[in-house]
């Protein structure tokens, strides 16, 4: 069955990658289908839904359950060619007639509950984001009007597989427990969407900021988080993972009024920042050996040292070479100076930025000029938050 997305795709790496649709679209379509059956009195196999992006979806209704004054049905999530943990799950909507006027919406099993401030929903509410909520209520209202129904309706969105899937998402870090969030701003999933990941980072940053954290502690990935926990006297539970998006993280911090960011980063990622590379994914750029070799020369290393570094495969191997030439300290000073320069360049010095850099084999390699100020501010901030 055609779903309306057959002509929508992007080309990445010479491959045609299909669009998909969000959990928000699934919830709205399931809700529309359940309402149609409940009020229209006729069984139907498909439902159409216009997404905010302007793409009309035609989706198959699954697991239809009809009771007195209540109908439940589901839509199977199709994320297209996006690597999405929710791909293939069933998103259910139960719509029930009520004596009270108006439409109520809540989450059932597998839809997370908000336990911390700073999100779009209040504490205790279901993690159904604003656009999906609007889509669900609009679809239900329009269907009720179609059948001249003036009574009340109660909607429950549930995702049975969401309890386990939610544990693998950002939700536990955001204080959303018990399941996944019902997401989507356009209703459509674009393959390998960087925008979606950057948006999830923004949400986490905003939440930390709303809780009084004006100085943020950021780690690009698991290595940074592990080093922070095991080797630094800083509040590990406050760390935010920015993945490869160093530049975007700085931009978003400035936009929301953050005063500073301290990055705790592995040399393999952050050495790229010393060349002004603000997206550290290898698909975007990889100048690790060139950066280390040029800064080794700047620090006074012999040409042979630089040549060996250029032939190295990993930063750990390059560090072994620098150690052998006794050039690690001098080279890292140059690298850290360049990192500080490019961090400030990205922010136009609007906020305080710094980094602590390490490797898995050598441990602590150094920190940028403003890192000490940031460490002090984060610890002061943490004590103030504890005292509240």
Please name every model-derived segment.
Residues 164, 225, 364:
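Flexible, glycine-rich phosphate/dinucleotide-binding loops
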Residues 90-92, 231-234, 368-374:
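Surface-exposed flexible segments
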